[in-house]
Amino acid sequence: LQVQTIFDAETGLPALHAPITTMLVAVLVLVAAALWWLSGRMKTDCAPEEPEDALALPHRETGWILIAAAVLAAFGSAYLFFKEDSTLMKAAALLGILSAPVLAMMPQLPRWGGFGAALSVMPVLFFCLWLVVFYKENAANPILWEYGMEILAIAMCLLAVFRLSAYLFYRAKPRRAIFACMLALVTSLATLTDSVSLGARAVLGGWGIGTAVMCWIIINNFVPPAPEEDTY
């Protein structure tokens, strides 16, 4: 976003003391502080072993944010379904519509046992199909920058939902899940500054926010290590 707005349209030179640059510095400071806090907490606290505890909603407001993100993702998928001509893309968009409720219900899925685990696979299938279709449609384009960020965002969202789905199969890797969710958020937000379709913006925006919320839930549910029992 800074690169796209910092340069003067007439001279082509970067503008000095641009507000976006000041904001970027402030964001970097906040990111550094958040990483410092996170690294300290992950050294002392442990992730719960049970998915019900690891994905439990800490606050009701968090659930509403997830629902809003899911609605945005569903709107984007519906937009793609009606606007795209490709049959494969329509199939991917339909999977996206069906996957949006899974995002909203992600913290409740562990309660449903095997059915919840099966539902968690649906977003993985959606992003897999979307990634394949998107690459197929753009493989002949020699200008990688025109679609590179969007395909990267799709891939990172795929990685994030794969790591979240692993919780339902008792194969959770908390640190990898947190890293994948943050990558999904960053690449999705970066894609919003490109000239992509409204549907893709909504889908990536919704899933980017949703995976970020799930990342926060995972971190928030870290617990102190159990005290060691004295043995004599």
Placement of each model-derived feature along the sequence:
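Structural signal for membrane-spanning alpha-helices in multi-pass inner-membrane proteins
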Residues: W36, S77-L80, L103-P107, C215-I218
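Membrane-interface helix-boundary motifs at transmembrane edges
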Residues: C46-P58, M105-A118, A166-R175
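Alpha-helical transmembrane segments of multi-pass integral membrane proteins
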Residues: R60-L80, M89-A104, A117-F134, E150-L159, ...
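A residue-identity detector for tryptophan
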Residues: W36-W37, W64, W112, W130, ...
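C-terminal transmembrane-bundle signature of multipass membrane proteins
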Residues: L1-Q4, V31-W37, M149-Y232
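Membrane-helix interface and helix-disruption motif detector
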Residues: Q2-T22, A78-L94, L109-F115, V132-I151, ...
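Canonical alpha-helical transmembrane segments
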Residues: V29-C46, S99-Q108, L158-S165
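N-terminal topogenic module of multi-pass integral membrane proteins
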Residues: L1-A92
